[in-house]
Amino acid sequence: MTKKVFDDISRLALKALLYEVSLSPKPGLVDQLDNGAHDDMSFLTFVDSALALAPFFNTYLDIGFYHAKEDPGLIFERLRVSGIEAEQAMFSATKGVNTHKGVNFSLALLLGATGMYLASQPQLLAHVTAFTEEDSLAICQLVKPLTAHLLETDFGSLDLKKELTYGEKLFLDYGIKGPRGEASEGYPTIAHKALPFLRKSLRSTDQETAQLQLLVYLMSIVEDGNLIHRGGIKAWRQVKQDMLLLHNSSLSTADLKAALSAYNDKLIQKHLSPGGTADLLVLSLYFAFLENQL
């Protein structure tokens, strides 16, 4: 029974990756229509990458489920080791192109947390798509003890380092914590913003439109390290402002797609890509599938 459930949940994670790359148009991002602001990857690159990562999703679930009573730091290390193996498989499939490194990190944590949660909620093993909003929130909260050490380990001694990564510079200069911060706080953007927004949208519109609306909403609120890396703080803030205006407008699906297509052209010209937003969209879709919202 457990293996079948884990197979089903793993497919939902893969489905989330495929839905995200298929959603079109997405400004600056790879989709079915074009490669966005990327010249080294395509829609098919993302499909290859997703399929390469998929076999590891069961492993993440297994680690969380069968080691649920271990120290959270040890569980994190187990997930990290498997995550690196998955990352290597991704790079092999994409010939060295980084398509899903960030979201693989988050999926390892959230699938691991899902396994941990199932170990304490055996009744859910009989009904994979019977997860509630409370279940999703609890899974996000389980990531907090897994990553309690993460910010201190990665950012605690930056003043002693001679060479800093871009993420480390962002933290020192602006206090932006990126994916590490989101994880260490239990994915509040997903649990308290993206999922409530998506659930509400799905009550009043179709699935595709709801996902496009969620994309716009996320672009208006997310601390997107990819955008900042490519264009700086000013460009990121401008994108947020532009998307907030679009978010607050009441457009038909056709007009929304037209607006997103036009903004895609703008971001391509500026070589800007909201990859952080794309990752959070994937994670939001994963939970929506678990809850049978989509």
Curated annotation (Swiss-Prot):
GO biological process terms on file: prosthetic group biosynthetic process
Coiled coil: none
Alphabetical list of HAMAP family matching this protein: CitG
Keywords: ATP-binding, Nucleotide-binding, Transferase
Reactions this protein catalyses: 3'-dephospho-CoA + ATP = 2'-(5''-triphospho-alpha-D-ribosyl)-3'-dephospho-CoA + adenine
Top EC class of this enzyme: transferase
Name this protein carries in UniProt: Probable 2-(5''-triphosphoribosyl)-3'-dephosphocoenzyme-A synthase
Gene: citG
An example molecular function term from Gene Ontology annotations: triphosphoribosyl-dephospho-CoA synthase activity
Family statement drawn from the similarity comment of this UniProt entry: Belongs to the CitG/MdcB family.
Enzyme Commission (EC) number: 2.4.2.52
Family matches, as InterPro entries: CitG (IPR002736), TriPribosyl-deP-CoA_syn_CitG (IPR017551)
